[in-house]
UniProtKB/Swiss-Prot annotation:
This is Large ribosomal subunit protein bL12. CDD domains: Ribosomal_L7_L12. GO terms for cellular component: cytosolic large ribosomal subunit. It comes from Thermoanaerobacter sp. (strain X514). One of its GO terms (biological process) is translation. It comes from the Bacteria. SUPFAM superfamilies: ClpS-like, Ribosomal protein L7/12, oligomerisation (N-terminal) domain. Forms part of the ribosomal stalk which helps the ribosome interact with GTP-bound translation factors. Is thus essential for accurate translation. GO terms for molecular function: mRNA binding; structural constituent of ribosome. The gene is rplL.
Amino acid sequence: MSKEEILEAIKNMTVLELAELVKALEEEFGVSAAAPVAVAAAPAAGAPAAAPAEEKTEFDVILQEVGSDKIKVIKVVREVTGLGLKEAKDLVESAPKPVKEGVSKDEANQIKAKFEEVGAKVEIK
């Protein structure tokens, strides 16, 4: 199978199928898909010093702490991300973890409010 065929197959997958694929790849190769995100975000931390006039337009919502009602938090994760029950549960149990990335400030604040309503602690970066 060529690289182009693999990419074409991935393009035709649903979000749920992609989430399952990522999980299977993580298990198969013993890696975490979240690690590259954290590494990629680290250099950006120094960037504002170079361009202070540029305002950030994309934000990441990171689930820091679940709180006392894990089931309600899982429901909010499913609502916000569209993940299946198992994927949402895995995300909640592996907090701190990004829930939604590259969203507008308004959307990030709305998502944060939903999580805070059910007792979870979220950070917007």
